[in-house]
Amino acid sequence: MENNDVSQKKMADAVRFLAVDAVKNANCGHPGMPMGAADFATVLFSKFLKIDPKAPDWQDRDRLVLSAGHGSMLLYAIHHLIGYKDMTIDQIRNFRQLNSVTPGHPEYGHTLGIETTTGPLGQGISTAVGMAIAERILNSRFGDEIVDHHTYVIASDGDLMEGISHEAIGLAGHLGLSKLIVLYDSNNISIDGSLDLSDSTDQSKRFEASGWSTREIDGHDHAQIEDAIAQELKTDNPSLIVCKTTIGYGSPDKAGTSASHGAPLNQEEIDNMKNNLQWTHGPFEIPTDLKDAWRLVGLKNTRKRKDWEERLSKIDDKKKVKFLHAINGDISDLVAKNIQDLKEKYSNESPKLATRQSSQQVLEIINPIIEEMIGGSAAVSYTHLTLPTNGEV
């Protein structure tokens, strides 16, 4: 379901101008990243991302993590356009204001459609690896009919410079998480200036060394973006798509410069951007044809979601209970009882144990009860006593 009469470039421009207007209205924020990433984000949402704004908690939705959390207006603008009920135009106007649902960085549980809180660089991509692991584990338990979704990440240069990303990337490659796709907003600009002031890593080679499938594209060419995502959906490895973009895209004054990274465009610069992109609309104003095109994007997965709900309703009752138990994070009362019993034992006996030994004893009373338990230790599990002696984790 899509509106073929509306240019995807213009749909992306709608995202750009909402971001620019919101940051200017707040007099703070990061306009450059949403301006540069709007093209590949538009293709991702309109062509691939399996979500339904009318059912934001649909359990088999795709997950999208904006690891580059400073670019939050990219998500907020699109969420407004595709129809998340909390993301009204007034919320866009109130970007970064107290009591809004549009904080400077996305916050889980505060705003619909936000899968995890991001902001500290590297945190989002690492959390997404955990989400991709969870999808594969749940799929092995409940099958493709119930669990079959992808995890997408929008990551920045800064994300990939952080140490935490190295461990997560290595683990994802080692586990062969083929349903994990990272869209790397490679604009070669940091807030201090050109990226080469601080980093010269060939990210494609780094990811390849960790077992990822990689490709590089023009992050403003919609045909290249669509083809790249379509191809990476077919691989047996986690995927990195290096989207070469221009930060502050569309601004004749600030495109490609660090000046667009973390400061609003002034009115003259916005007027020049409007002339450059042939945008004739006022602040926070989206023309009807673009609104309609984006609303269709928001509706395109309704049928898939309803079909999934029907499949879920037909599975064995015991299996359904286990699935909902896992999804909701429900924990048996037996866990609390067993832990309390162990605490009383320690209190009565005062055993002399290393912390790792008492930790192992706790794990051994909860592992058999919590099927969702994931644990281990990087190459030293026998020393750390994180491997259970009474069953698999």
Predicted regions: what they are:
Residues M1-A14:
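Generic start-of-chain signal for non-secretory N-termini
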Residues A14-C28, Y184-N187:
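N-terminal capping segment at the start of a domain
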Residues G36-H174, M373, S377-A378, L385:
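Cofactor-binding active-site loop characterized by glycine-rich and histidine/acidic residues
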Residues I51-K54, H110, T116-R295:
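Glycine-rich ThDP/TPP pyrophosphate-binding loop and its adjacent helix/strand module
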Residues L299-S358, I366-I369:
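Hard-cation-handling environments
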Residues Q361-E372, S377-Y382:
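Accessory "access/gating" subregions that flank catalytic or transport cores
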Residues T383-T389:
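Conserved small/polar residues in nucleotide/adenosyl-binding loops
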